[in-house]
Curated annotation (Swiss-Prot):
Function as written in the Swiss-Prot or TrEMBL entry: One of the proteins required for the normal export of preproteins out of the cell cytoplasm. It is a molecular chaperone that binds to a subset of precursor proteins, maintaining them in a translocation-competent state. It also specifically binds to its receptor SecA.
Gene Ontology terms for molecular function: unfolded protein binding
One Pfam entry name: SecB
Organism: Haemophilus influenzae (strain PittGG)
Keyword set, alphabetical order: Chaperone, Cytoplasm, Protein transport, Translocation, Transport
Protein name (Swiss-Prot/TrEMBL): Protein-export protein SecB
Cited NCBIfam families: PRK05751.1-4, secB
């Protein structure tokens, strides 16, 4: 009997990360200079921006939104070829994680699961605009998380240093 209680307690302590739903929250594709842009030499300059948003939507339920914005201009003329914006989202059940683990899960693991969907959507939108194929390179969300944590630690150390200087 006590083994069953221990098994139940151990099960309750296990970290949980489950996908509940993956969906497109928002999408936009603009090609303001069509059709004359196709008469120019195709030397694209790609601008890429990536961010995430997280919202707790219930007990152990989190919505994570991966925002991708791609703006392509032509090098010679500076004309905008296209602007593609995608908000790929998912609802995840997450429990049994400490603060840093939870932050890593929400800002690295969940976006990593969403990225292939967003990359495919961007590729399809660009293709439907009849532009040359655009395949976004994989993103190392773990490295971005480490970079974020290092920035946070540096900012915290800087704040402590400033507080100590004002005390003296």
């Amino acid at each position: 009997m006590s083994e069953q209680k221990q098994d139940v307690a151990a099960t309750e302590q296990q970290p949980v990360l489950q996908i509940q739903r993956i969906y497109v929250k928002d999408v936009s594709f603009e090609a303001p200079n069509l059709p004359h842009i196709f008469q120019q030499e195709w030397k694209p300059k790609l601008g890429f921006d990536l961010s995430t948003e997280t919202t707790q939507v219930g007990d152990d339920l989190y919505e994570v939104v991966l925002n991708i914005s791609v703006e392509t201009t032509l090098e010679d003329s500076g004309d905008v070829a296209f602007i593609c914006e995608v908000k790929q989202a998912g609802v995840f059940t997450i429990s049994g994680l400490e603060d840093v683990q939870m932050a890593h899960c929400l800002t690295s693991q969940c976006p990593n699961m969403l990225f292939p969907y967003a990359r495919e959507l961007v590729s399809n939108l660009v293709n439907r605009g009849t532009f040359p194929a655009l395949n976004l390179s994989p993103v190392n969300f773990d490295a971005l998380f480490v970079e974020y944590m290092n920035r946070q630690q540096a900012e915290n150390a800087e704040e402590k240093s400033e507080e100590e200087q004002t005390k003296h």
